[in-house]
Amino acid sequence: MKSNFSKFKDFIKYKKVAVVGIGVSNRPLIKFLVKLGAKVTAFDKKHREKLGSISLELEEIGVDLVLGENYLDKLDGYDVIFKTPSMRIDRPEFVKAKEAGAYITSEMEEFIKYCPAKVFGITGSDGKTTTTTLVYEMLKKEGYRTWVGGNIGTPLFANIEEMKEDHMVVLELSSFQLMTMDVSPEISLITNLSPNHLDVHKDFEEYVWAKKNIFKYQSSDNLLVLNKDDDLTNGMENEALGDVLKFSLVEKVYNGACLSNNKLTIQGKEICDSKDIKLKGRHNIANLLAAFCMVNKYVSIDSMKYVATNFSGVEHRCEFIREVNEVKYYNDSIASSPSRTLAGLNSFEKPVILIAGGYDKKIPFEPLAEGGYDKIKILILMGDTKNKIKSAFEKVISHKKCEMEIVIVNSMEEAVKVADNMAEKGDIITLSPACASFDMYPNFEIRGNEFKNIVNSL
């Protein structure tokens, strides 16, 4: 049952509130809390010089700042603490604050709790952003006032008072955001599950447990959408509290969506032919099927078909850049896990020259090597994980008695130069790192943009 936002306004007024993190996504939250009458202190590891003008901007509206290396040591004495999603709730500083009586929460928890609109929540290891965007586009095409947020778009909590009951909200939710959730969206989807973010989660079990929070608190009239082709998600049907729809690329599904004789269908109704879809790869057909399940109750077949046959993809996701000397370049910088890179490799008709490697999330690369060795012509590796990925592939190559050239490089520029020199006419070169970007870049967008800039300068 949704709570009225006036309850939150009454609760937060005059409260001593700490907001941990002064990043771009938290700034609207800080300003909104001030507007609601809270006494806000913003915490950040960065010093004033690094933060730039935002520190002055916040101080001018009455926000106190706690900055620098030991910033979390000063979390005592607050009524409410808004934590940044990637920070674990069991950090000693949060445990101590909670024991002292602080209410620890996050922007997303409070948003879902009080949002008057219908909320569609999407999580999973792969396909989240594309599916979130597809659901958003389908609802928008049908004529709904639709908002998009979570991991993409803009932070929505500051806009909550503009939202109405007949609006629609589509959220991409990470395991970090879901970890402390005690509220679930009315319509929820888990795209698939494979090991990811094990640098933050204790183990894969905890990662899966966090993902389940997207449906754990649903009611009997809510909907959960599950991937029938993924054993882990398929088995979650038994834990669902409301209705369940499933989607599949390989089996006929009557209570859900499937690919049947190259036709995309929802509950037996044909939407379109797979050859008419602009999105590249079977994984994107799965994303479309998942989106159909989510919007089935609210969107016409015509709106679904329009989006399916006109939507050409999201930047940094198997994005075609250009063709140089009959060699095609693709940017798949979003691929920050082995399973996502495998999905990208499967979307090409022939083995590719793959540029991979990056920040180490403590996840295994053996599944990528075993599933991808025959889809890669040349493997170019960089970043913290280069030797770890090389080792995984060398084992598989030795076992399969096959050949693959593996080249280690030290920068994106060198990777593109090597790929360009080694490529032959008709080859495909793709950046699909199988890793996060944080060893070399602040995020996957900046990594993808650098790759595109280098390719465009060839």
Swiss-Prot record:
Pathway: Cell wall biogenesis; peptidoglycan biosynthesis
Enzyme class per UniProt: ligase
Transmembrane regions listed in the UniProt entry: none
CC per GO annotation: cytoplasm
Single annotated GO MF: ATP binding
Entry keyword set: ATP-binding, Cell cycle, Cell division, Cell shape, Cell wall biogenesis/degradation, Cytoplasm, Ligase, Nucleotide-binding, Peptidoglycan synthesis
Domain of life: Bacteria
Main function: Cell wall formation. Catalyzes the addition of glutamate to the nucleotide precursor UDP-N-acetylmuramoyl-L-alanine (UMA).
Name this protein carries in UniProt: UDP-N-acetylmuramoylalanine--D-glutamate ligase
Organism: Clostridium botulinum (strain Loch Maree / Type A3)
